[in-house]
């Protein structure tokens, strides 16, 4: 080999090795551990539904226990409307904390909307295994309630003010502390 070839060959081999490594890394997509619609962390988004601009959200459904879930009956209190599904791990992880919030705060009510294709009797059985203190109603994934935007990911949580208007929307898992901060900020802004 000539001196110039002896310098070029190692450089060529090193570049080739780097290209092979880079190609391998791009080909290795991480396997999803949860469905793609589950968001990793909560973000807030401004409400952009007609209900937010037109006044109180109107929604009346039958809860899984057979009672009527009517958002109008919650006027005067802050309402957390949580879209969730049985297959959504972040949704299930936040349910006990939302249940505790519902029981602890008299000025905050929580309602759950199961955005799931599960059969209604299977949903009732699921809730017996994962009980919560707040009412749950099932909503159709094909025809979600017009009062809210179709969830782009789960969980999606709306905070309604005491007049029933959308105050805030959270995309992804939410904590009671985040809800309470939003309630406190909303209450302070109105006083």
Predicted regions and their residues:
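Bacterial signal peptide processing site
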Residues: 24-27, 89
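Sec-dependent bacterial lipoprotein signal peptides
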Residues: 1-22
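Structural microenvironment flanking redox-active thiols in thiol-disulfide oxidoreductases
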Residues: 92-130, 140-146
């Amino acid at each position: 080999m000539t001196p110039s070839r002896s310098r070029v060959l190692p450089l060529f081999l090193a570049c080739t090795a780097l290209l092979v490594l880079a190609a391998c890394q791009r080909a290795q997509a991480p396997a999803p551990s949860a469905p793609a619609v589950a968001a990793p962390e909560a973000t807030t988004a401004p409400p952009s539904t007609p209900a937010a601009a037109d006044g109180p959200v109107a929604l009346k459904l039958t809860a899984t226990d057979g009672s009527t879930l009517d958002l109008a009956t919650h006027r005067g209190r802050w309402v957390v409307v949580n879209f969730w599904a049985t297959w959504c791990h972040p949704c299930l992880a936040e349910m006990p904390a939302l249940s505790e919030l519902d029981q602890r705060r008299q000025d905050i009510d929580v309602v759950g909307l199961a955005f799931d294709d599960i059969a209604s009797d299977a949903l009732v059985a699921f809730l017996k295994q994962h009980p919560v203190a707040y009412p749950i109603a099932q909503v159709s994934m094909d025809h979600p309630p017009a009062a809210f935007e179709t969830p782009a990911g789960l969980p999606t949580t709306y905070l309604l003010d005491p007049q029933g208007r959308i105050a805030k929307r959270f995309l992804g898992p939410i904590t009671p502390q985040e809800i309470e901060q939003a309630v406190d900020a909303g209450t302070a802004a109105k006083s």
